[in-house]
Amino acid sequence: MTPVETLSLPRTPTIADIAAGERVCPVCSRSNRSEYVSLDSLPEDLQKLIRANAPGKSDDCEEVCGRCARLFERAKEHIIKDAAMQKDGSHVLSTPLRLDADERFTGEGVCIAFLDSGFYPHPDLTQPDNRIVAYRNLPDAEKDLSSLFKPDVASWHGMMTSVVAAGNGSLSNGFYRGIAPAADVVLIKLARTGRISDQDILDGLEWVLENREEYSIKIVNISAGGDAEKSYLNDPLSQAVEECSAAGILVVCAVGNAGHLPNHPVVPPASAPSCIAVGGLDDNNSINRARRGMYRSSYGPTIDGLQKPEVIASSIWVPAPILPHTPTAKQAALLEKLDKSEDEKLHDVIRENPGVDPDLDAAVGLLVHNIRQIIALKIGQENVINKHYKYVDGTSFSAPIVSSVAAQMIEANPNLTPSDIKRILISTAERLPHHEVDRQGWGVIDPRRAVEMALSLS
């Protein structure tokens, strides 16, 4: 057997390959002309893991490409020990695993600023080391980092975006981590409520420009949209984005979630020329390329005729943290406990946790199989992975994934400019077949190839 670690990366099959009978990996749907690994030649636990996460009938999976063998071999212990398992036996995979991120780089030494509605000092950012190097509350300047420990509704969004990018997965033994789990973060609260205006974002960018050297800010993530379509030629917010880029700060923006609307508008700051506007990928919680589709993300051309988004990244089934000390956290903890409890203990667990979930309170007198159905339904409805994490969706989470890859690239090659990073991400992206180019730009980011290209330019 060819050693797993020496196999080269397979490529995505073309129409010509398929027509010619090219072999396609049953797990990732990539093509590789010669380098396949027989599952029977792998350790039994690795065989079971690969079969459990292969689409379709697992018994039909007899061999996989070297890329998949390496990927699951690297992550085997983590998946078996820490990944949540779904009812079909497959696992809730992490973002780095699904996108095959390069584990050699963690964003160490790179600072990402997040502009959002609110934040929380989540353990995935603060344990074992606190990587929140600064917090700024623009509407309430007197409030410091200690005020973050009082969570409110506005805390959710920014907590999730920052952790999706830079969380180290401390509450999952490192499994549900971001692609840049060692990056430093600056958290900038833009508004008192969830509504964020053009002026709020502009104020945030101006703060970043004024403080970029003190905190060595290299990337700004903006998972928020402005008020309306505007030309970048006379829009102050777009001009601020251009100023950031000229100052050496990469600006990454969520393109929005209006792809289902007739005009599917792209608004500032995502419509600014130099930013990386990120659209949405639906990968169905799988590494199988054949299962990839588009999310309902907004798309251009912009009012100025610019192609937006430039790239797409996972925007559904994205593991993100649950805000601690909230009713949602209590509900998730109870659902996980019930899901893992033996049948004879279900009624007692519900009685011991009154008031957490009214539907569960009402189910305490039902038969066990009925309670199991309610638990499964609740876990699905609430997108619960476990007591600490849940699924989220939206391009608000695609953008921080791209920001985290950019942090890896800067760690690999600190001399990269914002335009270099954008060019590399575009040139290494992979287009989805059978989907409009306008919707996806240059396609799905490929973190591993992007980092390799960044290294090659150093």
Whereabouts are the PLM-identified features?
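Short recognition patches in nucleic-acid-associated and regulatory proteins
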Residues: L7-K57
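Cys/His-coordinated zinc-binding microdomains
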Residues: S29, G66-A69
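Short Cys/His-rich "knuckle" micro-motifs
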Residues: E35-L39, E73-H78
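Active-site core segment of subtilase-fold serine proteases
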Residues: G89, L97, D102-V164, Y215, ...
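Subtilisin-like serine protease catalytic core
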Residues: D100-R136, L148-Q199, S216-K218, A246, ...
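Substrate-binding/access-modulating region of protease and related hydrolase catalytic domains
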Residues: L190-S274, N284-N285, I303-L306, N383-A399, ...
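C-terminal subdomain of the subtilisin-like protease fold in secreted/lumenal serine endopeptidases
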Residues: I217-N221, A376-F397, E411-S458
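Active-site-adjacent substrate-recognition loops and nearby beta-strands
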Residues: K230-Y232, V255-P273, G280-K308, P319-I371, ...
